[in-house]
Amino acid sequence: MNIILSATITNSITESMKPALLVLGLILAALVISCIVFTAILARSGGISIGKKIVLAALYVTTLTVLLCTFLCFRQYQIMEDMSATETANSPSATQTTAAQETEATTEPPTEPPTEPPTEPDPTVAPAHTEKSDPANWKVKWSIMQNGTVLDSFQRNETIDFGDASQYSALDGIVTFRGDNYRTGASFGTTDMVSQTLTKKWSAKIGSLKGANGNWTGCGWTGQPLIVRWDDETKAILGLYEEKKEKEGLVEVIYATLDGHIYFYDLEDGSYTRDPIRIGMSFKGAGSLDPRGYPLMYVGSGDSTTKSPRMYIVSLIENKVIYEQSGSDIDAYRKWYAFDSAPLVAAEADTLIWPGESGILYTIKLNTAYNPSEGTITVSPENTAKTRYKTNTGHKTGCEASSIIVGNHIYYGDNGGMFFCVDLQTMELKWAQYTRDDINATPVFEWGEDGVGYIYIGTSMEYAKGNTYIYKLNANTGEIVWERKFTDVAYNERVSGGVLSSPLLGKKGTELEGLIIYPIARTPSVSSGTIVALNTETGETVWEVVNRNYHWSSPVAVYGSDGKAHFILCDSAGKATLYNAAGEVINTLSLGSNIEASPAVFENTFVVGTRGQTIYGVSIE
């Protein structure tokens, strides 16, 4: 706008100078003519008196003065005209005619071009320990290793940067345990219930597998299925039955189970989408699909059967294992090598991140080569860097729960009650916190209204006899925001009590907003269970429900398009129960036997397996 006004003013000045220059030109011409005529007259008259000489000199001086003024004025006129041309060319209205410019300037103020509102950057964590979260408090001995050598320092070549949980996966569905890198929950889409009932839709029988100390049957803890709607391009090259490749909108259930198989079902009717993959190792954990939409599955075994526990990478094009790595690691302090946790993949860095029960945190460069047009995918993994640690707690190291990753920082807990924050760029330990007991339940992360990240953690009961704890931690400092202690947990050496279920964090904008829901097993008696809904800000109990049967299964939300919220929780008697946001029972469905596994919801259907060797698809109506 300033440019337009400046150009208009300059044009006005140059226009007003034209008459003045014309007058000066006429005066100058008259003076020149007078000088010529007067000089000629004096020359003819012979002698020139002193008085006439003075008049003639004055006439010449006046003429020269007017000539100089005329020259200066003309020069200024040229400068102003050049300025006007330049400003007009630079103005936003340069392509309009002069008349249009004058009309705009005299009728209404010019409109400034609209400006985009500044984009707020995504919130980030900036972890650093305080006096209360200093790893030295527990004498943590932290080692960064590469190729069997302890490093003084490490710097990753690739940048690891996990975005918001909503951006983790390119696929529609549930691609890892509790859905994403924040572990926000295992539900996809919305369901507007009418009758508010649960109805068996289909079932599929599975088997058992002999383990080190008995038989592993059906689906166990944590045992969540993965559910995905493949895009057409990927579906065309998958190892699916031809009729399933041709099916419009196919949604596939992928279930790694205790009987050593990975099963594949059509969510709609429970029919096989491809042959099961027999690996022969028991799978307690859910595993993960590649969030980039690549046809890869990452899954870890939980017990020694035919060989030591290990991590697997499975091609879903060829339906076979294309890479495996034993957890039997000479660098590990703990000699238990299972992989129950569900790993995460840093997409742009092409890096697999996987804490193991041996206490080793693995980061593996995959070197993935994927060619959709040719229907091929390969990996050539390199163990880039890993960490190991010791503490003075006297408890077990090793990670059984799944980790959280925010930005380039991983958060995870161990079987001894330690909880860590690690910078994945440098593998440095940023802070540590002690939670008093075994962390089996996967934690959950959320951004607070203050822009600070927070983590919710629950402990199962192994060391703190009779007690279990729930914490809210500050993700930057590692300090405890609030803590809840539950003192009526029955102790059982064979079957754990306390918090084994991963919590349900209420989604913003729904009836569950502001709540964190935890099932607590074996409380107040050895066979019963309690569900507590806590206020996320204060930790205070909002409501509490005591059930006859305990829960290892994790609650899963069912959200309506209008913000209405329910949740489903399965128990040790094989019952699936639908609750409303106030903790009131809406409907129940018996699935026959103990449900340790956690369900996953895809729109109006949930899938869960039982220890009774059956997988169910259940309609949410």
Model regions and ranges:
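Small-residue packing motifs within transmembrane alpha-helices
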Residues: 21, 25-26, 30-31, 53-62, ...
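N-terminal, intrinsically disordered, polar/charged segments of Gram-positive cell-envelope systems
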Residues: 4-11, 76-147
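Cytosolic-side transmembrane helix boundary signature
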Residues: 33-58
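Internal/C-terminal transmembrane anchor helices
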Residues: 51-75
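Extracytoplasmic/lumenal domain signature
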Residues: 122-163, 177, 184-221, 226-339, ...
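Membrane-embedded alpha-helical segments of integral membrane proteins
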Residues: 5-39
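Hydrophobic single-pass membrane-insertion segments
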Residues: 40-45, 71-85
